[in-house]
Every structure is written in structure tokens, then in C-alpha cells.
Amino acid sequence: MSRCVITLNAGSSSIKFALFREGLTQEGSAKELTPMAIGLAEMVGEERRITVHDGAGAKIYEVKRTEHVDAPFHAEALRRILAWRQSAFPDAEVVAAGHRVVHGGVHYSAPVIVTDEVLKYLHTLIPLAPLHEPYNIAGILGAREAWPHVEQVACFDTAFHRTHPFVNDVFALPRRFYDEGVRRYGFHGLSYEYIVRRLREIAPLHAAGRVVVAHLGNGASMCAIRDGLSVASSMGFTALDGLPMGTRCGQLDPGVVLYLMQEKKMSAAEITDLLYRESGLKGLSGLSHDMRELEAADTLEAQQAIEYFVFRIRRELGGLAAVLKGIDAIVFCGGIGENSRHVRERVLEGMEWIGVELDRSANSANAEVISSERSRTRVFVIPTDEEGMIARHTLALLDQMAAA
């Protein structure tokens, strides 16, 4: 019987999940993972719903509940996901659940089996990723309760960036803070890792070269990659740094925080809420965190929010190209990167100095390659697959344990 793995990406009021089956390629020479189902459990107001699509994108299951439920969202949702899986795929041998965990701190540079000791350490990282880590942990606890006999594997967004040289990890603070773990971690590592894997399949020469990847979504960051390894990232100690995001401010003069504390008398909790939940595109536009709504809006504030978003991407692109001492390829991924032709066009405008010439018709069609044939630097649009990477890591870790 083929092994199956469930992947979970838990947020505050949602759980993205997927069921993968391991099999052999048509040639029978290598193992491959096939997505059997991809779903979303979410809570909107008092309504709790689960929607599932098959690997081809067709909806195969949907259920909604509006009555009051006393059970915590994550625990109740995972029990319902388990019940659906047992009904829809009764013969699937689920050997593990793989979890996206945003922050792994200094201790974890590779996936690990979740133990009580691991969970204890992850709790200490909540202040570094308050929008994600508490809910990642809640997802793990809910999965443990729902599936007590299934291995739980934590896969970290920070792990891919542990190849950074010291100079790209350190802050100009007294050295003791670095030794205590105050350093640049970088995030979206599972996404970047998948992009490297996919690039090796479709453009191996570029994958072995100097690549800048822009993961642009509600969370946004950029990464410089050389020979498939992370060299530098726009994010730092927390997932707040770097590019402006849907509701997060991105790069900010630390003096602004001191001003808010000293002059505005704002508490740490108030500043946290401001920087994580009320800033970014939402704060600048006064309208929405959603790029689609901003592109459709005709207000000056919405256009200025987009302009600032593009400006920061262009500035980061130039800096990362300098870190790499040149650039062979650019990759756009994430919800905005994959779908907003306007953002991509504005980011690449005037980038001939790094060898980019845009094919406007290909860009408008969201083609896989959007640079012209004359472009020295190749530009790709590649849908990312964090769930697939989690599944691969999870099964690989089980294989390592079995071989030990």
C-alpha cells in the first residue's frame, strides 16, 4: 500500500491542508508525490466551513456549520478533516502529518519530529512570529489530539536560510545579542526551496546560477540564491522586516518605534498590533490589504500604496543583485507575483541595466517565462508549492529514521 501524508498550514482562523500519495514515476525509476486532495477549513464569523478540491482542481467536498461550537477552532476542524479523509479515502495509509512552522529559531535548520521538548521551544518563538507561530502550534496540538498515532513533523520556513554567510545574518548590535539568537533568520523558506526544485526541472542552468526570487503575497519577501542555496533574504529577525505586506509595515527605522513608545505613549501590545495588523498596503491605502482591490480602486491612496510596494521590491532587487555580483534569473511567485501582471511590469520597468527585457504579451498571459528572447536575464513566473515541499520533507524524515 502506498504511503500518504497530510500537510497542514494553520492560521488564526483557517487551516490549509492537503493529502499526498507516494508512488513511482511512469518509468518506475523514482518516487513521486501526487496530490489527492487540497482543502481549506476556515472560520468566517460564526460559520465554520471546509472545502476540498481534488488534485485537478475540481470541488469534491464542501460542508458549512453555522451553529455555535464550543470546541476550539483548530481541534474541531482537524477532527472534521480526519472524518472526511476516512470517508473519502478509507484505504489511504496516512503515516504522518507535516506542519508548516514559520519560525525555527537557532535550534532547527531541518524538519523534526514534534516532541514535547520541540513544542516547548516553539512556544518561546511566538514573540518573533505572532501572526503565525501560535496558530502553527495550535495546528500541531489539534493534530496530535485528532490523530494520536500519527507522527507529527514540523517543517520550518527559516530552515532554508541557514546557509547565509555571517555578514547577512548579523545586526550591528553588541555581539552577545547575536549569540543569544538575535539575528536575521529569513522566511518563506519552503516556498523558495520549492522554486529551486522546480527551476532545476525547467531551467537547470539558471537554477545553478544567480537567482532572485520574489515571493509576493499577503506576506512578501525576496531571496538571493546562488547554486540553489540562500545567500540573503529581505526578511530578518521576524517576518515583519523587508518589503511592505498586506498588513505588515516591512522595513522601518527603529527610531519610529522609540517615538511611538516615548512620544505617543503606545504600549508594546499596541505597537505590535499597529505594525503587524494595521500597516502595509492596508495602512497606506486606508482601504484594503488585498492587491486586487487596490488595483481596482481609483483612489490616490490605493495607487500610492501600490507605488510604494513596487518601489521597495525594485530597491530590494537591486540590492540582492549586488549581493550576488550579478543576476541570471528572476522568479515571481506567491499570489501577487503569480497573478498581478501590473505589479510585475512596474517592477521590471527600466531594469535593462541588469539585463531584463520584458515580453509584455507573455507577461499579460501570466506565462511561465515573461522575458523576451533577447533578455540576458531570464524572468519566470512559477506557482509555488509549499504543501508539496512539506510532504517531501515529511516522508524523507521518516525514511531517515527508518534507515538509522
From Swiss-Prot:
List the catalysed reactions: acetate + ATP = acetyl phosphate + ADP
Q: Which residues bind substrate?
A: R100
Where, if anywhere, are coiled coils annotated?
none
Q: Which SUPFAM superfamilies match?
A: Actin-like ATPase domain (SSF53067)
Which top class of enzyme applies to this chain? transferase
The UniProt GO MF terms for this protein read: acetate kinase activity; ATP binding; magnesium ion binding
Q: Which Gene3D superfamilies match?
A: 3.30.420.40
Q: Which cofactor does it need?
A: Mg(2+); Mn(2+)
Chain sites annotated for binding ATP: K16, H215, L216, G217, N218, G219, D290, M291, R292, G335, I336, G337, E338, N339
Its GO biological process terms? Answer: acetate metabolic process; acetyl-CoA biosynthetic process
Give the CC-aspect GO terms.
cytosol
Which residues hold Mg(2+)? Answer: N9, E386
The residues responsible for catalysis, as annotated, are D157
Give site residues, Transition state stabilizer.
H188, R248
Q: Of which family is this protein a member?
A: Belongs to the acetokinase family.
Q: What is the name of the protein in this document?
A: Acetate kinase
